């Protein structure tokens, strides 16, 4: 029955972790001929997508794809315990841009992780610039929150606890005093 719902946003950054279930969901949407647009504002796992899952998702009503790279540095991926396959991530974004040019693509990145170098941050910027088409490439500055594993890591690598406290109230686009490299690089 048509209940008047035309847009659904999934606030779930692991919605596509189980590819079989992800594909089954969109196959059901297609089978039931639902006229609904789907959005993923908190991002999908970009390296876990496949051409098949991308095709089914787009045919099933996805308007675009939001993915989070965070960093294009393999070392920083390990530090963050994200460990995504950067090349597969790139291939999937390129496929979406080529096969679905009207799909709205959003890419989330961050810089300013403790121990990150300017060269590693530049790897992420170079990744963004190398992409043929991204509608919304976002770069945020890392915030270190008290009581987290990231805070422990930062303190173990010389980040001042006072700088962490000072950074808490800053917006994600403001330069944090915890930045591990030149402020000029970020601005």
Give the label of every model feature segment.
Residues 1-106, 111-113:
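Conserved SAM/AdoMet-binding glycine-rich loop
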Residues 104, 119-187:
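C-terminal accessory regions of radical SAM enzymes
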């Amino acid at each position: 029955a048509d209940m008047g719902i035309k847009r659904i946003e999934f606030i779930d950054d692991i919605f596509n972790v189980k590819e079989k279930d992800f594909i089954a969901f969109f196959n059901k949407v297609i089978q039931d001929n639902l006229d609904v647009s789907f959005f993923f504002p908190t991002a999908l796992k970009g390296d876990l997508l496949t051409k098949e899952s991308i095709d089914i998702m787009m045919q099933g009503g996805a308007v675009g794809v939001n993915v989070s790279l965070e960093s294009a540095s393999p070392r920083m991926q390990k530090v963050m315990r994200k460990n995504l396959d950067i090349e597969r991530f790139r291939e999937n974004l390129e496929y979406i841009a080529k096969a679905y040019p009207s799909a709205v693509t959003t890419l989330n990145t961050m810089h300013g992780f403790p121990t990150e170098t300017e060269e590693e941050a530049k790897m992420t910027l170079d990744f963004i610039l190398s992409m043929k088409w991204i509608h919304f490439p976002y770069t945020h500055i890392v915030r270190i929150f008290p009581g987290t594993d990231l805070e422990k890591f930062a303190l173990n690598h010389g980040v001042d606890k006072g700088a962490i406290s000072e950074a808490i109230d800053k917006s994600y686009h403001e330069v944090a005093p915890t930045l591990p490299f030149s402020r000029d690089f970020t601005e």
